[in-house]
């Protein structure tokens, strides 16, 4: 089934070339069916790339989705044209009186700061509080997951001595949770972060369930009561070359960055990346949409 996006959104062409079914709002309004309202709070500086990554995954389901892109009003985005934000994005103030079936909160390159030092923290807190009563289920990704765990449950983050960077093997810890329906017992997911949350802190919160972790990368998937809040510390949405681009960017900046682990063939950055997370990435997003959004949301929000 299609996703509904603005006909002029640049990601639309990319998705159509990949056979992801997208639909204009004009066409969708002629159908006698209610699309799921999904908001994406895009905190990444590379907004267009993140749009394509997430739309690619949520568009690969048999559900019709009405997607609303959000940005932070209290933060000046320097890496994206203001025209793009004006044309395709809304702020929380624009939608705070609406309800949504699902919300995705992305990562952000601010993890070395304390949460309170982030310039849009107060606005983000309002959005996370709003999500508790106005959103059926919220999926938090990477720093967004750290922020959600901290705000909702007081789970802290800790600095890492070295960046967690690469593609890592994870083990399913809860076999019968719907979010992991169809998962292999061992699966891969990318990570790219300078901080971590710790398993002992997660297990110390009775409302939280640890679903999957890695011996090397640590906590990956966590779920709250009734699936209202889902936390993914890794980046299952990443495209094939995202880690490569991050690696090359940091090298160009003169940073001391290691080759991403388990990513390039033979761990050689001159060779092609080896994609081992795509199928489980699709499964993660489709399970979230199906079991925690579509099957739980009321017809009238």
Curated annotation (Swiss-Prot):
Q: Where does substrate bind?
A: 163, 192, 249
Catalytic function, reaction form: L-homoserine + acetyl-CoA = O-acetyl-L-homoserine + CoA
Recorded E.C. number(s)? 2.3.1.31
Alphabetized InterPro entries for the sequence: Class_I_gatase-like, HST_MetA, MetA_family
Which protein are we looking at? Homoserine O-acetyltransferase
Q: Residues in the active site?
A: 142, 235, 237
Role, per record: Transfers an acetyl group from acetyl-CoA to L-homoserine, forming acetyl-L-homoserine.
To which protein family does this belong? Belongs to the MetA family.
Which residues does the UniProt site feature Important for substrate specificity point to? Answer: 192
On the tree of life, the source organism's domain of life is Bacteria
Give this protein's Gene Ontology molecular function annotations.
Answer: homoserine O-acetyltransferase activity; homoserine O-succinyltransferase activity
Q: Where does the UniProt annotation locate this protein?
A: Cytoplasm
Pathway(s) served: Amino-acid biosynthesis; L-methionine biosynthesis via de novo pathway; O-acetyl-L-homoserine from L-homoserine: step 1/1
User: Site annotation (Important for acyl-CoA specificity): which residues?
Assistant: 111
SUPFAM superfamilies named in the record: Class I glutamine amidotransferase-like
Q: Which GO terms describe its biological process?
A: L-methionine biosynthetic process from homoserine via O-succinyl-L-homoserine and cystathionine
A single cellular component GO annotation? cytoplasm
Q: Which Pfam families match?
A: HTS (PF04204)
Which leading EC class covers this enzyme? transferase
Q: Which UniProt keywords apply?
A: Acyltransferase, Amino-acid biosynthesis, Cytoplasm, Methionine biosynthesis, Transferase
Gene encoding the protein: metAA
């Amino acid at each position: 089934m299609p996703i509904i996006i603005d006909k002029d959104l640049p990601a639309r062409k990319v998705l159509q070339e990949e056979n992801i079914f997208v639909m204009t709002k004009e066409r969708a309004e002629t159908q006698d069916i209610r699309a799921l309202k999904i908001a994406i709070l895009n905190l990444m500086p590379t907004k267009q790339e993140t749009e394509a990554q997430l739309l690619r995954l949520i568009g690969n389901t048999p559900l019709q989705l009405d997607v609303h892109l959000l940005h932070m009003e209290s933060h000046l985005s320097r890496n994206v044209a203001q025209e793009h934000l004006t044309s395709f994005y809304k702020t929380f103030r624009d939608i705070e009186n609406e309800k949504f079936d699902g919300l995705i909160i992305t990562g952000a390159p601010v993890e070395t700061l304390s949460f309170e030092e982030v310039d849009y923290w107060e606005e983000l807190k309002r959005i996370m509080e709003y999500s508790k009563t106005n959103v059926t289920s919220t999926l938090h990704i990477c720093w967004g997951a750290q922020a959600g765990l901290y705000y909702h449950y007081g789970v802290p983050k800790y600095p890492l001595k070295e960046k967690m960077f690469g593609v890592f093997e994870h083990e399913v810890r809860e076999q019968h949770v719907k979010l992991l329906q169809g998962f292999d017992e061992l699966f891969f997911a990318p990570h790219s972060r300078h901080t971590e949350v710790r398993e002992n802190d997660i297990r110390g919160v009775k409302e939280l369930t640890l679903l999957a972790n890695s011996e090397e990368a640590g906590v990956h998937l966590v779920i709250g009561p009734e699936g209202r809040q889902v936390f993914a510390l890794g980046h299952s949405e990443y495209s094939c070359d995202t880690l490569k681009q991050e690696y090359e960017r940091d090298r160009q900046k003169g940073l001391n960055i290691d080759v991403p682990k388990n990513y390039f063939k033979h761990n050689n950055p001159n060779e092609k990346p080896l994609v081992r997370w795509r199928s489980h990435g699709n499964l993660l997003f489709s399970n979230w949409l199906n079991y925690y959004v579509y099957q739980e949301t009321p017809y009238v929000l």
